[in-house]
Structures are given as structure tokens and as C-alpha cells.
Amino acid sequence: MYLNVGGVPPRAAKVVPLVEVCGALTPSTMLPLGTKAPEFSLPDVVSGDTITLDTFKDKKALLMMFICRHCPFVQHVKNEIAKIGKDYQNKNVGVVAISANDAGSYSEDDPDSLKEMEDELDFTFPYCYDETQEVAKSYTAACTPDFFL
């Protein structure tokens, strides 16, 4: 996947931390600006399809949102998260949400509950479950919500 920033011809997918909104006790870290976007392969909780970085290869950019259902910060902005998907679906920008919480510790974040959240908010983008938290770790997403562009 390639990202075109500032009119520069695309070379390689780069991660740009867009916004860092985290709980006061959980510091968020960022990958260095310009880091190649880590590959991922995760199930969409709604369709069951496997979503990868390559899924968005024809998009101008990809917004990755690490969110979950139980987080009070996500609850506060969940309608705006849904609106982002609707606003950008026809602008050639890919959007994906990923939940990496342990469903054993947070039952509200199991795949069935995530699907209910997607249904409730009518997401227009895939909502994936990162059961092993490997994708979140590769992006250094330490809390929710964490946004990467």
C-alpha cells in the first residue's frame, strides 16, 4: 500500500499517527513518522472476511482506528467514529477499526459484542478483532481510541 502525502509520488506505505487520545494513565507511543505500515491480517467481525493492509492498496490513504466497545473515551466519540466512515467512504480513503482487547477480561469486547456495536452505529468500514493483540503491538497502539493515518 502506498500513501501520497503533500503531492509527493507514493513510494511505500507510511504510518502517520493522526490523533492520540488515551486514558490519563496509559501513555500512547508512536511509531516514528514515515515508518512503513506493518502488515496485518484480521477477521472482520461482521462479514467474517479477512482484512489485510492489501485490502486498501488502491486507496489514497488508510485510517486505522484502534477502538473497543467498553472504553469510556470510545463511547464518548463513537458516533463521530461512525460519521468518519460515512464521510470518507466516497473519497478514496480506506477506513478500518480494530479491537485488540482481551475478550476474557472485557466481555463487552468479544467479537459478538463488537458486531452489535457495528450494527448499532452502522459502520461503513470493516471492524476487525485482533485476538492476539499482535497488530496493535506492531502499530504501538497502547490504548483506545488510537488513530493512525
Residue ranges and their predicted role:
Residues 3, 16-54:
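N-terminal "domain-start" segment that seeds a small globular fold
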Residues 10-16:
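Compositionally biased, low-complexity intrinsically disordered regions
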Residues 53-77:
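Short active-site neighborhood of thiol/selenol oxidoreductases, capturing the structured segment around
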Residues 115-146:
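Short, internal strand/loop/helix patches
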Residues 73-88, 108-111:
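Typically the conserved alpha-helix immediately C-terminal to a functionally engaged Cys/Sec
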Residues 58, 90, 120-122:
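Short, well-ordered coil/turn elements that cap or connect secondary structure elements
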Residues 92-108, 123-132:
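Thiol-based oxidoreductase modules, predominantly thioredoxin-like and allied folds used
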Residues 40, 145-149:
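A short, hydrophobic beta-strand/beta-hairpin element that forms part of a small beta-sheet core
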